[in-house]
A protein has these predicted regions:
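Boundary regions of SH3-family modules and the immediately adjacent low-complexity/disordered segments
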Residues: 19, 105-145, 152-159, 171-173, ...
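Membrane-embedded alpha-helical segments of integral membrane proteins
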Residues: 52, 57-97
């Protein structure tokens, strides 16, 4: 499926009142194409309409790092890393073998700088690839669901951790299948504000 397919499907779901499905589709579109501005704009819009609104990210450094990471695909970052590495070797070779002082200085500092570029490009490539292929995140599909403090249905109010609503995005950290029954799978999840609890698999859908 393409990012455009999920974008259009998300629009259709939103028009039919299914905000959770719409958010899921926009998230999938952005996983395939992190630079899809229309999908990001629509996701931000629908997120403003749900009960459990995600808080805006305030860490400027983290936002900038992610924006640079999303500037290119994992493949493109890998090409940049390889090119920077080869050029850094050429720079070091110039430093080692050139007779002119100026050329040696350019080779040394240029090679060192390109080596730093190589390291960062590899980091961006790995992170971008992980973002595109991982299945660690999910969206709540139920209108309302109680999360449990234990890895099963809460038996009393003391075992209810908190309640989430349709459209909330979660990170899956662990899972357990009770009695080997796939229909009784529970995920340990983390919310955007770092709360942790258990939720039944049937209440969420994987991005």
């Amino acid at each position: 499926m393409s990012a455009e397919y999920y974008f259009n499907l998300g629009n259709a779901y939103y028009r039919s009142g299914k905000k959770g499905k719409a958010i899921l589709c926009y998230e999938r579109a952005l996983r395939l194409n992190p630079r899809y501005e229309k999908a990001q704009a629509n996701l931000d819009f629908v997120n403003m309409k749900i009960i459990d609104r995600p808080e805006p990210e305030e860490n400027i450094l983290a936002v900038g790092f992610r924006n640079v990471q999303n500037a290119m695909s994992p493949t493109a970052w890998t090409v940049v890393a390889m090119a920077a590495f080869l050029l850094s070797i050429a720079g070091m070779a110039a430093y080692a073998f050139a007779s002119a002082i100026t050329l040696r200085k350019v080779g040394f500092f240029g090679g060192l700088g390109l080596l730093v570029v190589c390291v960062f490009a590899n980091v961006f490539a790995a992170r971008a690839n992980n973002a595109a292929t991982s299945h660690d995140y999910a969206v709540v599909m139920n209108d309302s669901t109680q999360l449990s403090a234990v890895s099963r249905e809460p038996l009393n109010k003391d075992e209810v951790a908190f309640t989430l609503h349709e459209g909330a995005k979660l990170k899956k950290n662990d899972s357990i299948r009770i009695d080997g029954n796939v229909k009784n799978t529970w995920y340990k999840v983390q919310t955007a504000d770092n709360r942790e609890a258990w939720i039944k698999a049937s209440a969420i859908e994987e991005i």
